[in-house]
Amino acid sequence: MTWSWFPYHPLRLLRACYVSGMDPLAGSQWSAPGTVAGFAQSAPNAVLMAFAKEELRRAGSSRVLDLGCGAGRNAVPLARLGWTVVGTDLSWPMLCAAAARAREDRLDDRLYVVLAPMERIPARDRSFDLVIAHGIWNLARSATEFRRALSEAARVAKPGAGLFVFTFSRNTLPAEAEPVAGEPFVFTQFSGEPQCFLTEAQLRAELDRAGFAPDPGVRFREYNLPRPGTLSTGRVPVIYEAAFRREP
């Protein structure tokens, strides 16, 4: 059996975590046992949960895509709320942890995990009532990858679907920091690896170009801003949090 909106067998997706030794992120921090355990113990985003509750009341159905779901920090609570959740990630250990949590909470009929990159989502057009990009788009290594990820999110979102964004702000870095050559918002100064740090204007423009309009129901927030006169926050990123909506 397959879902008409998602051409994969859900049980196979869940069980794949336990039988596959393939891990695209093997050896990276994202698949390290300590990192996975830390993510598995992290509390869900309270603002996201409140937004998801309202979206569940508004939507005629209840399908949510959690991009970069990790160990299920938000995906498991979303399933508990009543959403049918598809969580994607590129770390097998993270997906295994999310699947294990779903089984422990008897939510394996509501949470399905898939090994997939954010710019190639294995779902049909207009499949989801809510899309979550929580700490994932900032990991894009180029503007091209970032824009493809936004385009994919727009493709699989139903018209009017909500989008919850949690991503790095340009204010994380000193004003004099220079982006990677040829890139408008990709920097290496934070971690040594290319990552996306957009200004608010850039983020809004990119989402508008992809077909997402701001949702006034969730205030655009910026967390961890440095105090006046401080140029850098050190190892703590400044974070944007906002909601948007897929335009018809």
Whereabouts are the PLM-identified features?
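Class I SAM-dependent methyltransferase SAM/SAH-binding core
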Residues: 72-120
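A short SAM/SAH-binding and catalytic strip from SAM-dependent methyltransferases
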Residues: 130-144
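A short acidic, Gly/Pro-enriched loop at the edge of an enzyme's catalytic core
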Residues: 119-131
